[in-house]
Amino acid sequence: MNMKKKEKHAIRKKSIGVASVLVGTLIGFGLLSSKEADASENSVTQSDSASNESKSNDSSSVSAAPKTDDTNVSDTKTSSNTNNGETSVAQNPAQQETTQSALTNATTEETPVTGEATTATNQANTPATTQSSNTNAEELVNQTSNETTSNDTNTVSSVNSPQNSTNAENVSTTQDTSTEATPSNNESAPQSTDASNKDVVNQAVNTSAPRMRAFSLSAVAADAPAAGKDITNQLTNVTVGIDSGDTVYPHQAGYVKLNYGFSVPNSAVKGDTFKITVPKELNLNGVTSTAKVPPIMAGDQVLANGVIDSDGNVIYTFTDYVDTKENVTANITMPAYIDPENVTKTGNVTLTTGIGSTTANKTVLVDYEKYGKFYNLSIKGTIDQIDKTNNTYRQTIYVNPSGDNVIAPVLTGNLKPNTDSNALIDQQNTSIKVYKVDNAADLSESYFVNPENFEDVTNSVNITFPNPNQYKVEFNTPDDQITTPYIVVVNGHIDPNSKGDLALRSTLYGYDSRFVWRSMSWDNEVAFNNGSGSGDGIDKPVVPEQPDEPGEIEPIPEDSDSDPGSDSGSDSNSDSGSDSGSDSTSDSGSDSASDSDSASDSDSASDSDSASDSDSASDSDSASDSDSASDSDSASDSDSASDSDSDNDSDSDSDSDSDSDSDSDSDSDSDSDSDSDSDSDSDSDSDSDSDSDSDSDSDSDSDSDSDSDSDSDSDSDSDSDSDSDSDSDSDSDSDSDSDSDSDSDSDSNSDSDSDSDSDSDSDSDSDSDSDSDSDSDSDSDSDSASDSDSDSDSDSDSDSDSDSDSDSDSDSDSDSDSDSDSDSESDSDSESDSDSDSDSDSDSDSDSDSASDSDSGSDSDSSSDSDSESDSNSDSESGSNNNVVPPNSPKNGTNASNKNEAKDSKEPLPDTGSEDEANTSLIWGLLASIGSLLLFRRKKENKDKK
């Protein structure tokens, strides 16, 4: 970074200047020779100029030769970041502090170095150069006291006070000798504060150079005039506005917003001030004990700091930001509250505010609302002061403001039930004062109380703390009744460690004219306005449930968050509503709060349309033991469009006893596109008793790619009684790759009546590798009526090892009407070991039309041991037209035989006699016997192995 430092010096046009230079030169030579003498100056300006040299242990000092021409250096504002356009300055609502630091004019090519406005800020190593003028006597000479070193820091403290007082500066020094300087008539004395800004700057100056001397500014600061001037009437483009409703409810957190805008003249310098007039009907603190106004921020830099004077107006003081900027504009928004001391009654109030000659006014209705009343009991309270520094609050309660006759009155105060109130109510933290009001008309509706106007009867009442966080006031009168109002002022403490808000409940007990014991309560809370940190109270009348027994006071449990409403009820003739809103573009350093009543009635209706596209990856280990009894009537009409990619790895151990009685009427249109990769280990033990009536009308279009690796161990006892009426149109395109190891032990008792009408169009490519071990006991009673039209195109590649041990007892009546059109290509490699005991009683009536086109290649090793007892009645009607061409006969009849006679005569002719047919039968019989023996032997070996 290219650091640029500029020093500007002004030449005083006085004859004494040359003499001063000569005297200073001689004294300088003397100091260089002895290094013991201190420089002596009668001019504050020369001392200040010397003290503004930058001294840092990490960098060398930069000095500049004084200019010899008559150019007025104060006319030029040096800042590398200043452009000719208008600079808009907006208030920063988050900045609450109002102190300012020392001025620095050192700039770089990237950002100007300006003073920051923070509380108790320590700054070090800040090089500064002087800027003075030979004609303007109002220049800030105190800029010259901004020298810092790497070893010392500046401590900035803020004193906010409404009085116009000026505090002197104390400058510490590391030398033992200090001289008090007196300003000349032609020079401005150093001044870091003005009459409106109460900032006190304590600076530590390290004077290690031999020609630098330390001096005190206490006398100078005490006698110096104000550094800045009032430029209120020089501001341009001034706008003023009052933002509020036509009615303001002070006890419902009601407030008004004051808006201001203006342009700052380019001639403004640090220390200049302007004033905003605030109407006496408003204050800027609400219920907080102190008030602050927001600083005007330019980004992270402070443009002006504000204080409140003794008249309640706001005085802003410009910082050194305006020294390096032009065309500066600013906007201010402040929340303001109805002042209870100046506006004590409900009525119309005209508010007037402004800057200089530009003003705005608005007439609003101030409505304090009325107290709560129940029969002859009346009460109202407000929290009218909060001190967050000392953690204290003040609550003012009107008891019997209606002036009715209340017999045996008792007032209790405690934390509001069901809230996290931070109030501390006990004898050590709570002080109570009671005042008697002779005339109800003397009560102010704003709850402003001047104790001097009322009779203090605190010593005449009985004040106790019977329960934790509860006080009790008994009004001891000669006739044990009251007919005039009373004011109870509670000064309490807040728990600083609590995160809750201040919330209190006051309850008045007493007998009515019919000697019925009744009670009436009033709640007080505090609400803070957005952005400003100030607020107003929320007041709401509450009529609790009435006590059951005469003289009974509701107990307060140890837990202050519980609701002691067992003896409380609500019946009120008062209606309380709240219109509260906050819109703030300003941030105020003030801590302001107010006391308000709030009642809310809300009806909410929500209409939501939702569409979901989900990618899900799930890894789940689930163990479930569930006993479920469900009786459900469900009517569902659902249109669902789902696009889901799911990767599911699930280990599930489920033991479920389910008794389900379900009537379901479902009309579903589903369009599903699913890619599923599933790896599942399942161990299921299920006892299921299901009685289901299902009426399903389903149109399904499914495109599924499935890769499944499944190990299944299933032990299932199933008793199913199912009536199913299914009308299904299915279009399925399935590619399946299945590797399955299955061990199944199933006892099935099935009674099924099935009426099925199915149109199926199936295109299937199947690659199956199956190892099957099956032990099945089947008892089947089946009545089947089947009407099937089948069109099958099948390519089958089968490699099968089969070991079958079957005992079959079959009684079958079959009536089959079959039209079959089969086109089959079969490549079979089969090894068969069969041991079969067959007892067959078959009545067969077959009417078969068969058209077969078969290409068969068979490699068969067969070993058969068969005991067969057959009783067969066969009625076969077959029409066959076969044209068989022997292997050695010519394709073209006799003509071909004549042409190839010589060739054919060399080949032996086939035997056609009866003797050859007998020989052929004998050969085949021997082969069959041998094969049977081999098969029987192999079967026996297999049984021995088992």
Curated annotation (Swiss-Prot):
Biased amino acid composition, Acidic residues: 546-564, 598-874
Biased composition (Polar residues): 71-111, 162-199
Keyword Ubl conjugation on entry: no
Signal peptide: 1-39
Motif YSIRK-G/S signaling motif location, chain numbering: 9-20
Modified positions (Pentaglycyl murein peptidoglycan amidated threonine) in chain numbering: 912
Biased composition (Basic and acidic residues): 900-909
Biological function: Cell surface-associated protein implicated in virulence. Promotes bacterial attachment exclusively to the gamma-chain of human fibrinogen. Induces formation of bacterial clumps.
Family: Belongs to the serine-aspartate repeat-containing protein (SDr) family.
Family matches, as PANTHER family: TOL-PAL SYSTEM PROTEIN TOLA
Protein name (database record): Clumping factor A
Organism: Staphylococcus aureus (strain MW2)
